[in-house]
Amino acid sequence: MTSLIMDMNRLNLDKLKHENIFSDNIIEDAKEFIFGSRKIYTDSVDDLIELYSLAKYLNNQTLKDVVIERMDYVCKYIGKDNWSTIYSFYKENGLRNSFLRQYINNNIEEICSTDQFLKLDVDSVCDILDNDEIVVTREYTILNMVLRWLENKRVNIDDFTKVMFVIRFKFITYSELTNAIEKIAPEYRQRLQDLYHKKLRVLDIL
């Protein structure tokens, strides 16, 4: 049975190479893994992502596991230029990596200054910022990160509310709130003020 699956993989790889669905280098790397040394040495994040896509196409769990293992290693050298690509890989595939999370938490201000951060969807922004381990000196810093992200897009009021819930308003002064309201589009201003007072009322009750 195993031999039959391996033969099917070989046929699939040859077919994919012929049809140019995956790059020739990735096809050869997969062949080397499946039929050769069974190791992956590349440190290219893009190549690993393509290999993982190929593993999913072939439904080859062993290849998936090896790609993840290699990506976990590459993640130890994550930096400003590739954090977004690595983050997206783990998030889109339902995976977690503690080193990635630690890097984001410790370098959140640098990360949020990148163009890649501005391109994230609302779920990703919430996932990144809704974490008590983030290293910042003031909660207003997080609020400014959200405001910067909002400057580059228009989201509906539900998504606006969702992303604002990552802010711990109990650490935001009314003066800081006023400054924030002046920075955002008019359609969001009343909603932000309402959220601020609503959260404070909840805290008073508790």
From Swiss-Prot:
InterPro entries: BACK, Orthopox_C5
Organism superkingdom: Viruses
Signal peptide start and end residues: none
Keywords: Early protein
Keyword Ion transport tagged: no
UniProt xrefs under Pfam families: BACK (PF07707)
Keyword RNA-binding: no
Description of what induces expression: Expressed in the early phase of the viral replicative cycle.
Family recorded in the similarity comment: Belongs to the orthopoxvirus OPG030 family.
Name used for this protein in its record: Protein OPG030
Gene, per the UniProt record: OPG030
